Amino acid sequence: MENNKYFKQFVDRLDVNQNALDTLKENEITTLGQLSKYKKTQLKDMGLLQNEINKIEVELELLGLTLKGSL
């Protein structure tokens, strides 16, 4: 997956709300590659809402990336 051309791009490129982006950055997740190493449950523990996690997951899939443990 690390060969994906989006792996080193910033999470800001995701079409998600500002609250979700702020939460990711507060947890020092700044790149899509870093984000893809997290599980949904870990994102929820950071304070992200389920609908925000679902949106993040869809956005990653559109770029050929997934969250850890996702198919």
Give residue ranges: language-model regions:
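Compact, charge-rich alpha-helical regulatory domains located at protein termini
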Residues: 1-71
